[in-house]
């Protein structure tokens, strides 16, 4: 495999992961859906052609996506997967051909076809025919409980019709805002001087995320059902439609209608690729006249048995496809091209545009992706460009209208210095991305590092928003992430006041007002004496806020009854809570390049100890399944940096505690062999076969170091391989790495238990269900602790449930458990059990 292929796959993963982070975690996307889909498809094609490129943490193996913190999180009983996308007829025909070959049927394939609604995916749960819960899609595995807001949507049935209603039924569908409702809402909002909704899609999503359901009730929302999740008929749970209910997708939709769910009247059943493409054409022509927004059509194999036979890939069903419409476009003028710096230093060019309406939204910025894209398009300041909101969401510059270019424009060049910190902007050979070389000395990178560190899937510091992170970094109060754990309530209050003041003069006047209004009236004359009353005209530097703080401005002990402090106290409490974490969260929070959640989880499971991981030579990381050379080298590079080790030391010194440390997995024992180490060192020409041959003949790295190629040749190793290995070992850095890796390999073998000694948890093989609200810990935290003891935590009660943990306001699950004779635990018993087995924190 060519090095260029490896590098391209690495670049694609980096760009996709960055796009996922900005879209789901930061809510600040920088590339369009169309560009994302293009990158994703290219990566899939590379991984299909070169399977050895596939890793467990590849973006192709997971569903993107993030859950907001305002609502209770709920894990879906069956994941809400996304769909593969098609953008042309060839991809649609290939989709049909794949199913045809797999099914081996001589009859034309039938497909259920429907519009791709542009709203918010939702899962509705019914128990004994009554609505009990509505959960957003979230990241596909975990969503937000928006039940009270769902209840306000009139098209959602609260009680199902008919006599054959399942005991448990999960219905998947889309909440959307009709176009006429959107228009009427904005008319009323404009008349009242209120903020307008940007588009129906944003209106639907924002309405469901209102904490006050009375606000949601005022929004014109509607719902279409298009599928099902979990079904329980009598005592049997199904993760697919049972034959007794329906044998085809279209029949299942008809049954949903009979139960009272709204199903689009545009759903049809067609045959073959010709039928699919004809439907796509018809819906595309009718699109502008529809009462709701759509961004494509969806094709699903109608036969449910065929769906089961086709199965799933990790990200999507093989039996369904989303055929998307072309993005909407408008022309405007480029007023400037600026650089944004991301967490890893990536320098992304952004076009500042003359405001233009595209698909119902005013667009002022558009991504240019990278310097190569700018060069390809030859975008210049002053150009008229075509702006596309790919997927009808994120704007990008799609093309330049060359014949409208004004005279004397100049080609754009990537700046040589970072606009934030002044460090050199560099690009590694073969890379498309330019990066600021300042690393964490660059405030922009520090800000992104902080945002990642406190995010929900990392250290989960609730309440620390993006704007306040900017204040913390700009002020110099925090230099590294460990400084978060030194913050005080007084510092936060001081920062908030300085950050919200329009000028130092306004700040000082506010200070005087606070002092004069409390028990400090005697200081008023002093303030007047030093010129506070006269402040107002003198020019001050833009850095005045940070300068005041760096100068050691004393904390103001103002009348706390007149200053809101609860937010600061809550934030400090959230920071304190985050001190107790898990190894996988801690590793993910460090922001190591290429180390996503799944890789962090694998490292935790296989090695179990931070001190071991942070001092491990990079080749040994490759013994973990699905960690390849690129990720292993990235880990090694990160831990080789003294600054990163120092940052970890600071976090531990400030009492960040990792509570799930354990010995290395015994499964590693069979992997820690000299042959594997020789292979993992990536020595040119040393293939797995040659590595095994050399390991058998020599037994250790030391035996290879000083003999040159001759002993290798005598042992039957080909001359070219022997010379390559001997030459590689002559490089001091390589020799040091090999010796260090050999020693660590031996140490690992000595510290791990034998396979038979592997500990089992007290709840191994048992299924547990949690219901209601727990006072001492969240349900997610309880779930993690129970899983650490071997339990499988399920979402519904059955005869196989070992026990049910019932918190406050436990509902139908408690009733079901009692009727089945399942053991009931209250929170006190749970906490006692966790404490007994070392899971109290």
Swiss-Prot record:
**EC number(s) stated in the UniProt entry for this protein:** 6.5.1.2
Q: Which reaction does it catalyse?
A: NAD(+) + (deoxyribonucleotide)n-3'-hydroxyl + 5'-phospho-(deoxyribonucleotide)m = (deoxyribonucleotide)n+m + AMP + beta-nicotinamide D-nucleotide
Identify the cofactor(s): Mg(2+); Mn(2+)
Look at the named UniProt entry and state the broad enzyme category this protein falls under: ligase
Supply the Pfam families for this chain: BRCT, DNA_ligase_aden, DNA_ligase_OB, DNA_ligase_ZBD, HHH_2, Nlig-Ia
Q: What are its GO biological-process terms?
A: DNA repair; DNA replication
CDD domains in the record: BRCT_DNA_ligase_like (cd17748), LIGANc (cd00114)
| GO MF, one annotated term | DNA ligase (NAD+) activity
| Residues that, per the record, bind Zn(2+) | 418, 421, 436, 442
Could you name the active-site residues?
116 (n6-amp-lysine intermediate)
Q: Which InterPro entries match?
A: BRCT_dom (IPR001357), BRCT_dom_sf (IPR036420), DisA/LigA_HHH (IPR041663), DNA_ligase (IPR001679), DNA_ligase_AS (IPR018239), DNAligase_adenylation (IPR013839), DNAligase_N (IPR013840), NA-bd_OB-fold (IPR012340)
Q: For the BRCT domain, which residue ranges apply?
A: 758-841
Keywords from the named record: DNA damage, DNA repair, DNA replication, Ligase, Magnesium, Manganese, Metal-binding, NAD, Zinc
Residues the record lists as binding NAD(+): 33-37, 82-83, 114, 137, 174, 300, 324
Q: Which GO terms describe its cellular component?
A: cytosol
User: PANTHER family per the record?
Assistant: CHROMOSOME TRANSMISSION FIDELITY FACTOR 18 (PTHR23389), DNA LIGASE (PTHR23389:SF9)
Role played: DNA ligase that catalyzes the formation of phosphodiester linkages between 5'-phosphoryl and 3'-hydroxyl groups in double-stranded DNA using NAD as a coenzyme and as the energy source for the reaction. It is essential for DNA replication and repair of damaged DNA.
Q: NCBIfam families from the xrefs?
A: dnlj, PRK07956.1
Which family does the record assign? Belongs to the NAD-dependent DNA ligase family. LigA subfamily.
The protein's name: DNA ligase
Which species is the source of this protein?
Answer: Xanthomonas oryzae pv. oryzae (strain KACC10331 / KXO85)
Q: Which gene is annotated as encoding this protein in its UniProt record? A: ligA
């Amino acid at each position: 495999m060519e090095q260029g292929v490896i590098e391209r796959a690495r670049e694609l993963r980096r760009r996709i992961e960055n796009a996922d982070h900005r879209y789901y975690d930061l809510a600040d996307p920088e590339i369009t859906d169309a560009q994302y889909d293009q990158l994703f498809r290219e990566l899939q094609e590379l991984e299909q052609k070169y399977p050895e490129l596939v890793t467990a943490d590849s973006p192709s193996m997971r569903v993107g996506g993030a859950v907001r913190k305002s609502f209770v999180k709920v894990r879906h009983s069956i994941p809400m997967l996304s769909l593969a996308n098609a953008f042309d007829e060839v991809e649609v025909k290939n989709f049909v051909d794949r199913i045809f070959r797999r099914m081996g049927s001589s009859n034309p394939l039938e497909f259920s076809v429907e519009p791709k609604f542009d709203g918010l995916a939702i899962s509705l749960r019914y128990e004994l025919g009554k609505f009990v819960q509505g959960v957003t899609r979230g990241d596909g595995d975990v969503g937000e409980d928006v039940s009270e807001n769902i209840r306000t949507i009139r098209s959602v049935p609260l009680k199902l019709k008919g006599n054959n209603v399942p005991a448990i039924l999960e219905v998947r569908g889309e909440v959307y805002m009709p176009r006429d409702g959107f228009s009427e809402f904005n008319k009323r909002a404009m008349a009242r001087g209120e903020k307008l909704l940007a588009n129906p899609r944003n209106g639907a999503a924002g309405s469901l995320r209102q904490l006050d359901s009375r606000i949601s009730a005022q929004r014109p929302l509607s719902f279409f059902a298009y599928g099902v999740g979990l079904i329980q008929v009598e005592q049997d749970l199904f993760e697919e439609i049972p034959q007794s209910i329906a044998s085809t997708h279209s029949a299942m939709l008809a049954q949903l209608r009979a139960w009272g769910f709204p199903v689009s009247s545009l759903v049809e059943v067609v045959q073959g690729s010709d039928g699919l493409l004809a439907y796509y054409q018809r819906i595309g022509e009718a699109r502008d006249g529809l009462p709701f927004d759509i961004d494509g059509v969806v094709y699903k194999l109608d036969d449910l048995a065929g769906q089961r036979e086709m199965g799933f890939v990790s990200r999507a069903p093989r039996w369904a496809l989303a055929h998307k419409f072309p993005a909407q476009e408008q022309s405007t003028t480029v007023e400037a091209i600026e650089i944004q710096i991301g967490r890893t230093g990536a320098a992304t060019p952004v076009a500042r545009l003359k405001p233009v309406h595209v698909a119902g939204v005013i667009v002022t910025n558009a991504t240019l992706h990278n310097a190569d894209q700018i060069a390809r398009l030859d975008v210049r300041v002053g150009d008229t460009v075509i702006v596309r909101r790919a997927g009808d969401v994120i704007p990008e510059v799609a093309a330049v209208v060359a014949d409208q270019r004004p005279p004397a424009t100049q080609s754009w060049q990537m700046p040589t210095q970072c606009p934030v910190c002044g460090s050199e902007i560099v690009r590694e050979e073969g890379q498309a991305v330019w990066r600021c070389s300042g690393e964490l000395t660059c405030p922009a990178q520090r800000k992104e590092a902080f945002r990642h560190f406190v995010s929900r899937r990392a250290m989960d510091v609730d309440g620390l928003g993006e704007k306040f992170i900017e204040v913390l970094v700009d002020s110099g109060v925090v230099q590294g992430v460990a400084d978060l754990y030194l913050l005080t309530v007084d510092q936060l209050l001081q920062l908030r006041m300085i950050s919200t003041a329009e000028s130092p003069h306004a700040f000082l006047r506010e200070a005087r007002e606070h002092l004069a209004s409390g028990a400090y009236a005697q200081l008023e004359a002093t303030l007047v004496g030093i010129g506070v009353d006269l402040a107002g005209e003198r020019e001050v530097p833009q850095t005045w806020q940070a300068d005041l703080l760096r100068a050691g401005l004393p904390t103001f002990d103002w009348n706390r009854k007149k200053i809101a402090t609860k937010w600061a106290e809550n934030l400090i409490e959230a920071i304190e809570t985050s001190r107790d974490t898990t190894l996988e969260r801690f590793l993910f929070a460090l922001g190591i390049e290429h180390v996503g959640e799944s890789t962090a989880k694998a490292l935790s499971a296989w090695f179990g100890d931070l001190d071991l991981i942070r001092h491990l030579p990079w080749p040994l990381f490759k013994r973990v399944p699905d960690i390849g050379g690129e990720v292993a080298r990235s880990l090694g590079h990160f831990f080789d940096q003294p600054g990163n080790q120092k940052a970890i030391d600071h976090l531990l010194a400030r009492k960040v505690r990792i509570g799930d440390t354990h010995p290395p997995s015994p499964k590693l024992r069979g992997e820690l062999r000299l042959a594997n180490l020789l292979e993992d060192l990536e020595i040119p020409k040393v293939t797995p076969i040659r590595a095994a041959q050399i390991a058998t003949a020599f037994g250790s790295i030391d035996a290879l170091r000083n003999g040159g190629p001759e002993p290798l040749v005598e042992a039957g190793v080909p001359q070219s391989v022997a010379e390559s290995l001997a030459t590689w070992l002559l490089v001091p850095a390589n020799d040091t790495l090999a010796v260090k890796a050999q020693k660590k390999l031996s140490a690992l073998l000595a510290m791990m238990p034998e396979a038979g000694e592997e500990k089992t948890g007290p709840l191994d093989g048992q299924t547990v269900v949690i219901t209601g609200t727990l006072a001492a810990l969240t349900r997610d935290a309880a779930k993690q602790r129970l899983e650490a003891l071997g339990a499988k935590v399920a979402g519904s009660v059955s005869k196989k449930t070992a026990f049910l943990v019932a918190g406050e306001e436990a509902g139908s699950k408690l009733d079901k458990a009692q009727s089945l004779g399942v053991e009931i635990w209250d929170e006190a018993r749970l906490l006692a059990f966790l404490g007994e087995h070392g899971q109290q924190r």
